[in-house]
């Protein structure tokens, strides 16, 4: 009997089972202990293979692939700290709903806690963050193949969102020629090998429930808050709110077209919040709200009813409103709760939104971070998509820009970390094949600099704008102690990215004005390669411009 041959047959069953649940993209890091899984993935023609040498980046690459494909994405890593590097992407997926399947190779039990190399306690290491955790036994023909495949089917068949951790111990030898070891064990699955369905099929979860009193509430004064959702859902939500005559407060990730732009500016005006107090019901569609003033209003509002509709399970209201938590696909929910044509009830807010946008436009000429955030809608590629980083840049775009309705926007706004942003953007581009504009800050780019290797392989133009304000300038918006702000919060690195781009053979530009930026973008959208654009800006102008606009709009 060949141990290495049976390891591969065991792994082949695992990988084939994944294909029955829609897995097409599989991300693989180098490693020896994961050899059975890697070779099984390589031999399965159903997979699109992605590789990366950095497991943390690999996890985020998978996250980006899952965001666009809406299907589970598998990740294969070797044992040891390689596994721990998947933690950030797993946490993000659990909060934003992407499906990740983490196949982590492991040492067999006799090599754990005895000083063996690269052997750590992997079962349960992700605590409560996976939706399911499976600790497989060492491959053995004493366990029927039907147990293995049905165990995986049960975990994936009930997976609605988040990650599944499948820990896979393999004993040595890991290498060797294939022989007939385990063929009869595999063949006991019969015609499952020729089928395309799971061995064990779980019943789908029940459909959305209709709120029987909706016909009563839709006649009231309502407010629609739009958080993270798909581009198609964003367009439907905008039309739904318009028909109802309810003001729509659209987050940067809502893709609703933000019909009342600059919400995070005008929500700082007492006239706006006073008018919103008249709302009898607030319907929040989607989670992960960005704007500080929006979150403050959301926490303080006291309507008669507060409904939150999102496909993700769990509590999504940090203000703990009394109301209804409705777990449903947003598009399906809208169909069950049709709008009734009514006249808009808000008067002040549309006026304030227009005046706020005019205040922003009046400052658009300076070559700066806030101005780029406002102009970003002018620079979007046709039939493309936008990936927005975290920290200051996403807040500036949320507050100062108005993105087109239905234009795809992606970000990591679950745990809102700055790790893995370039890797996630790479996954977003690969899964869609669309031209992609990604925008991040300098610290975010430094944090995930390894991911420039992933950006060498794109199928359409990708432009990465690095806004270099020399540190974490978001802390300039917070009451951090001035005496320690630079050393312990901003942490300026005084670096530029020309040599990083050159190391990975990526195009690089550092425009000095809007005309140079626009010329660079025109050229970049013509070729299916990555272009790194470093926009060096004054350290504090972005934060200061936002604060000045907030003060100005609050007194309108």
From Swiss-Prot:
One of the GO biological process terms: menaquinone biosynthetic process
Signal peptide start and end residues: none
Catalytic activity from the UniProt record: isochorismate + 2-oxoglutarate + H(+) = 5-enolpyruvoyl-6-hydroxy-2-succinyl-cyclohex-3-ene-1-carboxylate + CO2
Cofactor(s) named in the record: Mg(2+); Mn(2+); thiamine diphosphate
Class of this enzyme: transferase
InterPro entries for the chain: MenaQ_synth_MenD, MenD_middle, THDP-binding, Thiamin_PyroP_enz_TPP-bd_dom, TPP_enzyme_TPP-bd
Cofactor note as given: Binds 1 thiamine pyrophosphate per subunit.
Pathway where it operates: Quinol/quinone metabolism; 1,4-dihydroxy-2-naphthoate biosynthesis; 1,4-dihydroxy-2-naphthoate from chorismate: step 2/7; Quinol/quinone metabolism; menaquinone biosynthesis
Record-linked Gene3D superfamilies: 3.40.50.970, TPP-binding domain (3.40.50.1220)
NCBIfam families documented for this protein: menD
Name of the protein: 2-succinyl-5-enolpyruvyl-6-hydroxy-3-cyclohexene-1-carboxylate synthase
Organism taxonomic ancestry: Bacteria, Pseudomonadati, Pseudomonadota, Gammaproteobacteria, Enterobacterales
Gene (name only): menD
